[in-house]
């Protein structure tokens, strides 16, 4: 039986502290393992326990994924009777949330590499593990789900050694579901993961590893004390801005919020200091005391730039201010979310937002709609292009409607990503066909015992929309994907403008690879013809490249039968009525506006269908 105790402050020896992350692929059991550690170490009573304790967002529980990094502090008494203070951080596994993983690793000395013993190593496991190795974090391999009948721990241990290249034959074998092997795991954490380095007597240095906004308390920051001690009521300084604040509250999560009067060197906890401005405590910044400030900032994790961009517009204009405030609060929670105001003739006022991937975009949109009750229209996602103009100037653009005239452009370069795909060998042919269809170039192919590791360079524009879905489809769900930006490469792209009755609709302007331009244009034009309601006059829909129409369709007018009351008589009377109607339609077309409902844009701009 585990000898675990409820949290009580009093561990003054840094050698008794262990800070570690749990990194793994989606659905390999990291959140369940976190729950088991909390339950067995007395963090919560049986009544307070629920599945996925650390996945606090409803979206996380619904999708069965972890989005935000969560921290917990528990105490453990080992077999020798010594008390150890364990701080662990549950991290996401999806490729779009890798920045959360790097953030957690910056606060740790060790990481549990959790691998499902029924599935083996996945591409994202590989990426996260290499990130941990680059950050000099001690890796402890853990083979989970050994209680399942199809578990093959020996095979998976060999896979870890072959593919990742770290020793794994003595990896901890456990079941987060039943609790088997958890005691051995905790002992391994204590023995293998090094204690924090730092000096309790040095000036305070605290790394902000996460922040979120509380409607009542303001900004709450999760911090790791690298040097010194932080006391309640201390006057602290944010080193990047030089601004000073008084500490109102400090404490730890057990996972319940527990107030303390100090945080010591090596510990991970939360801090509230009355910050109301959501950009005043940026993630990755360093806190120090105003009285005795540290000389240097802590070198934190690499700040990750957005990979894709899309326009977000409220369905009704009266929600704009609420939308702006909501984005401000979400951006504090999410260091990679970028946004700036954007104005569209068709969609009104909104924001141009930067995301790490399509899932990241969907999560942000879902949170805005659910937590803030804002109905949104999202434009088709695009990537950043490097453009060299005729005059030699180089610019970077992500908005198709802002692209200069094609005659002024010398070279367009698109971002290329290196995709690492792990799959069983039987799906290799289908995956290679898919990569070729997406304009991919094969870099490497390595056969391991039961899996093949494929490396392809593919344009990011092809990857961000539905490549992941198609990959899962052709591999029956077995293939996994991880990608990383490599370089810009010249490409022949064209800008397609959509015109309705000769008026350009900026929200529908897209960039396309020149060979796909005709089919994409025809697809959008045909879709619009079905969705736009008929008017009293003809509506022409055109797709245009450099003033040349490459696709066109016409929505025929609604036409009243003006001859319904003419039962006979002179034919000139009928001609006169028809001519009068024709002249009226001409006048109406000149002065009439085409009413395009916003629901039409919602349907056309659906990224999955586009």
Swiss-Prot record:
Residues 15-197 form the tr-type G domain. It is a peripheral membrane protein. It holds the Pfam family EFG_C. It is found in: Cell membrane. Gene3D superfamilies: 3.30.70.240, Elongation factor 4, C-terminal domain, Elongation Factor G (Translational Gtpase), domain 3, P-loop containing nucleotide triphosphate hydrolases, Translation factors. GO terms for cellular component: plasma membrane. Its EC number is 3.6.5.n1. Keywords: Cell membrane, GTP-binding, Hydrolase, Membrane, Nucleotide-binding, Protein biosynthesis. Its main location: membrane. Belongs to the TRAFAC class translation factor GTPase superfamily. Classic translation factor GTPase family. LepA subfamily. HAMAP family: LepA. This is Elongation factor 4. It comes from Buchnera aphidicola subsp. Acyrthosiphon pisum (strain APS) (Acyrthosiphon pisum symbiotic bacterium).
């Amino acid at each position: 039986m585990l000898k675990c105790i409820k949290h009580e402050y009093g561990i003054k020896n840094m050698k008794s502290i262990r800070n570690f992350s749990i990194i793994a692929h989606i659905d390999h059991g990291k959140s369940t393992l976190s729950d088991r550690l909390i339950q067995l170490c007395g963090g919560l009573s049986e009544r307070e326990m629920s599945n996925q304790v650390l996945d606090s967002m409803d979206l996380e529980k619904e999708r069965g994924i972890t989005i935000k990094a969560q921290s917990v502090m528990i105490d453990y008494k080992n077999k020798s009777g010594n008390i150890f203070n364990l701080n662990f951080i549950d991290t996401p596994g999806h490729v779009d949330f890798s920045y959360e993983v790097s953030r957690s690793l910056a606060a740790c000395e060790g990481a549990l590499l959790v691998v499902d013993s029924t599935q083996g190593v996945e591409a994202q496991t590989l990426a996260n593990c290499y990130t941990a190795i680059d950050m000099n974090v001690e890796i402890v391999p853990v083979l989970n789900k050994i209680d399942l009948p199809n578990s093959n721990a020996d095979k998976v241990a060999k896979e870890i050694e072959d593919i990742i290249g770290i020793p794994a034959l003595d990896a901890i074998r456990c079941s987060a579901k039943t609790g088997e092997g958890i005691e051995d795991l905790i002992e391994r954490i204590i023995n293998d993961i090094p204690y924090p380095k730092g000096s309790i007597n040095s000036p305070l240095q605290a790394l902000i590893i996460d922040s979120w906004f509380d409607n009542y308390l303001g900004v709450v920051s999760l911090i790791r004390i690298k040097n010194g001690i932080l006391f309640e009521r201390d006057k602290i300084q944010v080193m990047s801005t030089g601004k000073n604040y008084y500490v109102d509250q400090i404490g730890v999560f057990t996972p319940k919020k527990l107030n303390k009067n100090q945080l010591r060197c090596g510990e991970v906890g939360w801090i509230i200091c009355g910050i109301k401005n959501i950009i005043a405590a940026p993630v990755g910044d360093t806190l120090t005391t105003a009285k005795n400030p540290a000389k240097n900032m802590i070198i934190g994790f690499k700040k990750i730039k957005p990979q894709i961009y899309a326009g977000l517009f409220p369905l009704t204009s009266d929600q704009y201010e609420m939308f702006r405030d909501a984005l401000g609060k979400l951006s504090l929670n999410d260091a990679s979310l970028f946004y700036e105001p954007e104005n569209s003739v068709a969609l009104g006022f909104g924001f141009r937002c930067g995301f790490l991937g399509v899932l990241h975009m969907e999560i942000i949109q879902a949170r805005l709609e659910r937590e803030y009750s804002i109905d949104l229209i999202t434009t088709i996602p695009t990537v950043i292009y490097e453009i060299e103009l005729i005059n030699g100037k180089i610019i970077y653009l992500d908005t198709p409607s802002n692209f200069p005239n094609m005659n002024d452009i010398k070279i367009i370069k698109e971002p290329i990503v290196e995709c690492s795909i792990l799959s069983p060998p039987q799906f290799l042919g289908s995956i290679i066909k898919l990569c070729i269809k997406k304009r991919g170039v094969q870099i490497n192919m390595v056969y391991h015992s039961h899996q093949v590791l494929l490396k392809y360079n593919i344009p990011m524009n092809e990857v961000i929309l539905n490549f992941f879905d198609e990959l899962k489809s052709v591999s029956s769900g077995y293939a996994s994907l991880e990608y990383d930006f490599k370089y810009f490469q010249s490409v022949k792209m064209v800008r397609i403008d959509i015109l309705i009755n000769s008026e350009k609709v900026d929200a529908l302007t897209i960039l396309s690879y020149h060979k796909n331009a005709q089919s994409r244009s025809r697809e959008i034009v045909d879709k619009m013809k079905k969705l736009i309601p008929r008017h009293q006059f003809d509506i022409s829909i055109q797709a245009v490249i450099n003033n040349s129409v490459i696709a066109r369709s016409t929505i025929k007018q609604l036409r009243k039968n003006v001859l319904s009351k003419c039962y006979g008589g002179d034919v000139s009377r009928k001609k006169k009525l028809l001519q009068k109607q024709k002249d009226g339609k001409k006048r109406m077309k000149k002065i009439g506006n085409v009413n395009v409902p916003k629901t039409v844009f919602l349907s056309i701009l659906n990224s999955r269908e586009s």
